Amino acid sequence: VTSDVQWEIRARADREAIFRYLYQEAGLPVASATDDKLVSMVSILRENPLAGVKAGRTAKQRKLVVPHFPFIIVYVAEETVVRILRVLHTSRKVASRYSRS
């Protein structure tokens, strides 16, 4: 079963901030490669919504580690949709940042 993917507002803002920072610090190729990797990891969730491990405050909340990149994707897998909640750098204190609000 293929799920739809919905990027929540905070996740879209995270993705944009990551791209902007990497573009300024390392250039377009690095920013683009990182964004491509994030998109490819999220595409895995379309086919396998339970690919990540349980995390966060609710039973449905999960996280997917992005290999070779210092990011995790925080998401909720529902029946027909995967909602991407956040894209966070692994150095951040992430436990308190899993909330949707």
Regions found by a protein language model. Give the residues of each.
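Basic, Lys/Arg-enriched alpha-helical interface segments
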Residues: V1-Q61
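Structural motif corresponding to alpha-helix initiation and N-cap regions
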Residues: T58, H68-F69
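Short acidic-hydrophobic surface loop/beta-edge motif
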Residues: R62-V66
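Enriched for short, Lys/Arg-rich terminal
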Residues: F69-I72, V76-S101
